[in-house]
């Protein structure tokens, strides 16, 4: 049987990434050109800057991904691409490159939901058994997803306001930490104590919804009031207290979801899945099901995860036409 190679593109935000997946499970290359340094001084991602960077480097990323995989353009069997959710300008760069490559070589084009990519990155650890439950935590999303089979995703719970990664970056900015602040807050939290009483919104409510805006506001108010009074607060203790509140919320809702949807596997994915505190809480408290977390290199945005997610779409022959467009607000269906 002839080997099949998927060339995958990911440009939904501030990472330009191209990857090659061989025979559905062997990631041969996963090139990532990060723009973090360009966005740090703004304290967040500037969409126009992100789009321009994607244009500048995407051709080189394609060449590097193919070279690293040890294949040529003629060896590629299909092209996969993120078409949402994300920044519309950034998405369009990846879409344009993917469509051009697929059209020029007469290859099928596979559309992939960015969040499906995060979830299916777990496939790199071991073959997934369905049904399963997933906790997806990133800068733009916090949601619980029930997956009845590969490619069939249903949201069973999500945030009403801020995503957890967004809350991390906002409190990090208040403390003067470098963007993105998640890793630094995690490190500082492990050096401090949970001594500040921050709210755990909706933690006792009988639903699977999250809320982080109240926690974020309480943190900002405490920090602001201390500054006004000239009081000194421990950054380590602030981080420890904030992270403890976040983890309490995430764990409470995840446990409720596992009670409601009996599964054997819990996937935890997205950029925040790299958080050491979250991994420690999962290991200590989720013991009745197997917890699968993608390796750190596949937690952030990358094309490797898009390649893994494209396999089920390819098997279903879910191919896109040349009119495939960016869908910045693309979302999974909600469980009825």
UniProtKB/Swiss-Prot annotation:
It is found in: Cytoplasm. SUPFAM superfamilies: Actin-like ATPase domain (SSF53067). It comes from the Bacteria. Fe cation binds at residues 114, 118, 301. Binds 1 Fe(2+) ion per subunit. GO terms for molecular function: iron ion binding; N(6)-L-threonylcarbamoyladenine synthase activity. It is an enzyme of class 2 (transferase). GO terms for biological process: tRNA threonylcarbamoyladenosine modification. Its cofactor is Fe(2+). It catalyses: L-threonylcarbamoyladenylate + adenosine(37) in tRNA = N(6)-L-threonylcarbamoyladenosine(37) in tRNA + AMP + H(+). Keywords: Acyltransferase, Cytoplasm, Iron, Metal-binding, Transferase, tRNA processing. Substrate binds at residues 136-140, 169, 182, 186, 275. GO terms for cellular component: cytoplasm. Its EC number is 2.3.1.234. Its main location: cytoplasm. Belongs to the KAE1 / TsaD family. Required for the formation of a threonylcarbamoyl group on adenosine at position 37 (t(6)A37) in tRNAs that read codons beginning with adenine. Is involved in the transfer of the threonylcarbamoyl moiety of threonylcarbamoyl-AMP (TC-AMP) to the N6 group of A37, together with TsaE and TsaB. TsaD likely plays a direct catalytic role in this reaction. This is tRNA N6-adenosine threonylcarbamoyltransferase. It comes from Streptococcus pneumoniae serotype 4 (strain ATCC BAA-334 / TIGR4).
């Amino acid at each position: 049987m002839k080997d099949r190679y998927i060339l995958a593109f990911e440009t939904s935000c501030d990472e330009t990434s191209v990857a090659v997946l061989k025979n559905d499970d062997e990631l041969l290359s996963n090139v990532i050109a990060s723009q973090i340094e360009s966005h740090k001084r703004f304290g967040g991602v500037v969409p126009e800057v992100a789009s321009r960077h994607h244009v500048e480097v995407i051709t080189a990323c394609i060449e590097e991904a193919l070279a690293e995989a040890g294949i040529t353009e003629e060896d590629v069997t299909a092209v996969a691409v993120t078409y949402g959710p994300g920044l519309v300008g950034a998405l369009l760069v990846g879409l344009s490159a993917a469509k051009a490559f697929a059209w020029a070589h007469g290859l099928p084009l596979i559309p992939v939901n960015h969040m499906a990519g995060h979830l299916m990155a777990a496939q790199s650890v071991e073959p997934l058994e369905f049904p399963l439950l997933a906790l997806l935590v990133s800068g733009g999303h916090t949601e619980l997803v029930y997956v009845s089979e590969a490619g069939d995703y249903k949201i069973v719970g999500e945030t009403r306001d801020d995503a957890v990664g967004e809350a991390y970056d906002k409190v990090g900015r208040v403390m003067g930490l470098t963007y993105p602040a998640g890793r630094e807050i995690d490190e500082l939290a492990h050096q401090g104590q949970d001594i500040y009483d921050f709210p755990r919104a909706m933690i006792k409510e009988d639903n699977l919804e999250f809320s982080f805006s109240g926690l974020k506001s309480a943190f900002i108010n405490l920090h602001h009031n201390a500054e006004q009074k000239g009081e000194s607060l421990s950054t380590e203790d602030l981080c420890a207290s904030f992270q403890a509140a976040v983890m309490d919320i995430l764990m409470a809702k995840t446990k409720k979801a596992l009670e409601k949807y009996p599964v054997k596997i819990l996937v935890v994915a997205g950029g925040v899945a790299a958080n050491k505190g979250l991994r420690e809480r999962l290991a200590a408290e989720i013991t009745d099901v197997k917890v699968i977390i993608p390796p750190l290199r596949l937690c952030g945005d990358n094309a490797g995860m898009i390649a893994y997610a494209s396999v089920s779409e390819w098997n279903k022959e879910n191919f896109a036409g040349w009119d495939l467009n960016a869908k910045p607000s693309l979302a999974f269906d909600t469980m009825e």
